[in-house]
């Protein structure tokens, strides 16, 4: 499956997550930082995974811009999935998480979600990723590859 993993990362945690997902998806997977992503690459993908840290209850501005700039209907025949990195703190739930907002924008552009939005935990604002999160991300990716 031709998979494109588009990510943004502030402290490197979401980048590590994106690379773990790509490795689990196999040879057909490409990882691209959101600043280098474009609609042409998205159009060639069978699967688009968008990954962002949660910042103030939402994805980064760069990820939001990328998703909002995709041409209408550009994801019509594309399977999609949304992931984020997030804190475990209970107060964060008040603001929500990036993955849900990413998933909404992917659907708005015609994408077919093949998994619910997924969050992966970091130990603090700057990380690191919590224990076993990279392994959990790999297992998650193998699960969506089977769909």
Task: Identify the role of each PLM range.
Residues 38:
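Acidic, amphipathic alpha-helical patches
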Residues 7:
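Local sequence-structure signature of Cys/Sec-based thiol-disulfide redox active-site neighborhoods
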Residues 3-4, 13-16, 22-34, 44-147:
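FMN-binding flavodoxin-like domain, especially the glycine-rich phosphate-binding loop
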Residues 10:
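Donor nucleotide-sugar binding loop of glycosyltransferases
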């Amino acid at each position: 499956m031709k998979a494109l993993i588009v990510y943004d990362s502030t402290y490197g945690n979401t980048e590590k997550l994106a690379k773990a997902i790509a490795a689990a998806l196999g040879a057909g997977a490409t990882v691209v930082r959101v600043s280098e992503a474009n609609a042409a690459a998205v159009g060639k993908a069978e699967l688009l995974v968008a990954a962002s840290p949660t910042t103030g209850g939402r994805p980064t501005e760069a990820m939001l811009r990328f998703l909002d700039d995709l041409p209408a209907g550009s994801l019509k025949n594309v399977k999609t999935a949304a992931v984020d990195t997030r804190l475990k703190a209970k107060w964060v739930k008040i603001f929500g998480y990036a993955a849900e907002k990413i998933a909404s924008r992917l659907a708005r552009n015609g994408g077919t979600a093949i998994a619910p939005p997924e969050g992966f935990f970091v130990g603090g604002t700057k990380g690191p990723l919590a224990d076993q999160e990279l392994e959990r991300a790999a297992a998650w990716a193998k699960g969506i590859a089977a769909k």
